[in-house]
């Protein structure tokens, strides 16, 4: 009963290259293609079954490309302010596009990076988007303790996310970039370049 709810999904980590934007996979299980440097890519839509389940239950579904995915610049992995703004702006745009009432209930959902984005959207909603009627949030496994996250993934199969974070913060803060670059050897610089297109 009541106004149709809208669920804004924050996507899980897929990669930092533009080919990893959720909009590049569309509302499909995923897509395959080539990166800017010509290597093969797969964009897997991990959350696809959740989108479909929400739609089947009558919710309006919005899947946000986080800032820097599918557009110029580096994707801002674990930049919680930018992730919050991306989801909150997507909620506003989605309601407007659907001609939905401004007070329609909004929920945020995501896991891992998407969990961090969802948690941040809920946290910043009152300040950044007080016009939205945020009714609920699911934030699964958000990477909120960055030092602990770094320790747990360093040397693992998902270590590239460290490069995503460094690339994103380096683009936004010249001081941070200069401090990091002063500590990197050529192998470290190659790692950051590789992360930027993966």
Where are these regions (language model features)?
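Accessory cap/linker subdomain of secreted extracellular hydrolases
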Residues: 143-198
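Glycine-rich "HGGG/HGxG" loop immediately N-terminal to the catalytic nucleophile
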Residues: 68-76
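Short, surface-exposed "cap/lid" segments of acyl-processing enzymes
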Residues: 2-56
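Short beta-to-alpha linker loops that shape the active-site pocket of alpha/beta-hydrolase fold enzymes
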Residues: 13, 65-69
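Solvent-exposed, acidic/flexible segments
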Residues: 3, 40-47, 76-84, 111, ...
């Amino acid at each position: 009963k009541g106004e149709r709810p809208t669920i804004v999904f924050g996507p899980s980590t897929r990669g930092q290259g533009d080919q990893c934007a959720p909009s590049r996979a569309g509302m499909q299980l995923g897509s395959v293609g080539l990166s800017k440097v010509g290597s093969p890519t797969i964009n897997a839509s991990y959350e696809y079954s959740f989108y479909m389940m929400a739609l089947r239950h009558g919710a309006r579904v919005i899947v946000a490309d986080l800032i820097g995915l599918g557009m110029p610049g580096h994707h801002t992995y674990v930049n919680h302010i930018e992730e919050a703004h991306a989801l909150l702006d997507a909620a506003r745009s989605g309601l407007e596009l659907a001609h939905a009432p401004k007070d329609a209930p909004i929920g945020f959902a995501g896991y891992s990076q998407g969990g961090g984005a969802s948690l941040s959207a809920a946290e910043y909603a009152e300040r950044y988007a007080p016009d939205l009627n945020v009714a609920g949030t699911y934030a699964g496994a958000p990477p909120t303790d960055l030092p602990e996250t770094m320790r747990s993934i360093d040397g693992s199969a998902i270590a590239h996310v460290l490069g995503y974070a460094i690339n994103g913060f380096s683009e936004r803060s010249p001081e941070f970039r200069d401090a990091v670059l002063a500590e990197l050897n050529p192998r470290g610089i190659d790692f950051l370049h590789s992360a930027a297109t993966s």
